[in-house]
């Protein structure tokens, strides 16, 4: 247990950390085929960051997972809150067998439905439109449409008929 404790003098830990960072510079990954696109633009052959490599791979998945996780946790919290509110409203804890069929029927049907009465709105009204007839209605003769406002050489079909006569 004593071996896991930090030294009592804080000045001992700092030089060891500095030595670790100095010698760790030789252990950086060199640019290979899989890491070539993440290398610095300078002359050093070391990769800039593994976080950039991992970040490009996992960024979309991580964001979608975080959003899904937050929505899922909010749903669970809402469900628990609704359950607690229902229990508080009833002033009792929920137990198996408390809700019986008679209790459900009393909630759903507090009394007998009213007797059936004839609905006067369904009667045939005299102000309905006349029934559909297949005979075409007589339409008044229409005058031809006005000439096309664009190019004077273009004529509408009615003007072509008039011009041909």
Curated annotation (Swiss-Prot):
Family annotation (InterPro entries): CYYR1
Membrane topology: Single-pass type I membrane protein
Keywords in alphabetical order: Membrane, Signal, Transmembrane, Transmembrane helix
Residue span of region Disordered: 125-165
Leader peptide range in chain numbering: 1-29
Biased composition (Polar residues): 154-165
GO-annotated cellular components: membrane
Localization terms from the record: Membrane
Extracellular side: 30-61
Chain segments annotated as transmembrane: 62-82
Pfam families: CYYR1
Residue ranges that the UniProt entry lists as topological domain Cytoplasmic: 83-165
PANTHER family: CYSTEINE AND TYROSINE-RICH PROTEIN 1
Family per similarity comment: Belongs to the CYYR1 family.
Protein name: Cysteine and tyrosine-rich protein 1
Organism: Mus musculus (Mouse)
Highest classification ranks of the organism: Eukaryota, Metazoa, Chordata, Craniata, Vertebrata
């Amino acid at each position: 247990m004593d071996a896991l404790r930090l030294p009592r003098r804080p000045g001992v830990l700092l030089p060891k950390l500095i030595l670790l960072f100095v010698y760790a510079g030789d252990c950086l990954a060199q640019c290979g085929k899989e890491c070539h696109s993440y290398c610095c633009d300078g002359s050093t052959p070391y990769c800039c960051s593994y976080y950039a490599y991992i970040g490009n791979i996992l960024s979309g998945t991580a964001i979608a997972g975080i959003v899904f996780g937050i929505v899922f946790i909010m749903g669970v919290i809402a469900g628990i809150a609704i359950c607690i509110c229902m229990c508080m409203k009833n002033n009792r804890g929920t137990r198996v067998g408390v809700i019986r069929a008679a209790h459900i029927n009393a909630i759903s049907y507090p009394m007998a439905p009213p007797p059936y009465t004839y609905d006067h709105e369904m009667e045939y009204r005299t102000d309905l439109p006349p029934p559909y007839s297949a005979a075409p209605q007589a339409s008044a003769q229409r005058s031809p449409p006005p000439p096309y406002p664009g190019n004077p050489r273009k004529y509408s079909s009615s003007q072509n008929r008039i011009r041909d006569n």
